[in-house]
């Protein structure tokens, strides 16, 4: 987003929705990370135009840049699949100054299309994911038995007998 103002964040979500709606049918047929990358490269001008049109339709005049880069991402969950924080290849759609909070999704398989209501990653997407990750990486992102605890809170709970 251009900034963290409420207006910029709201239009960012509209741009995200328009871009996802545009690219969903094309990326859903991708069989590999390299194919997804090639699709996005060939569609980059169209993706930029979709983003610009959405901005203009909503009264915004910012420019849009689209490009690939390695970017740091926080922990991200898609239903029962969780990706650890780290550096990932990203296809960026920058609006204006690009100084606001961002939205992101996994490039391949295209997990941005996961059912947000039910939070379920389809089995075919999990199979594709297993095909591009090592066994250890796949176990890391799909293991739901992991528990996160904070030592300080554990100590306080023990102290209070909770």
Regions found by a protein language model. Give the residues of each.
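Soluble extracytoplasmic domains of inner/organellar membrane proteins
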Residues: 81-146
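Early exported N-terminus immediately downstream of N-terminal targeting peptides
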Residues: 1-44
């Amino acid at each position: 987003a251009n900034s963290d103002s409420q207006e910029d964040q709201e239009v960012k979500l509209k741009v995200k929705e328009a871009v996802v709606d545009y690219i969903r049918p094309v990326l859903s047929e991708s069989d590999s990370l390299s194919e997804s990358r090639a699709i996005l490269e060939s569609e980059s001008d169209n993706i930029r135009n979709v983003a610009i049109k959405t901005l203009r339709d909503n009264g915004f005049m910012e420019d849009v840049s689209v490009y690939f880069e390695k970017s740091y991402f926080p922990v991200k969950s898609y239903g029962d699949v969780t990706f650890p924080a780290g550096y990932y290849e990203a296809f960026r759609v920058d609006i204006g100054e690009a100084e606001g909070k961002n939205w992101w999704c996994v490039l391949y398989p295209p997990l941005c299309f996961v059912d947000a209501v039910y939070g379920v990653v389809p089995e075919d997407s999990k199979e594709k994911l297993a095909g591009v990750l090592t066994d250890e990486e796949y176990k890391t992102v799909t293991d739901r038995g992991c528990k996160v605890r904070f030592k300080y809170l554990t100590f306080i709970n023990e102290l209070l007998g909770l």
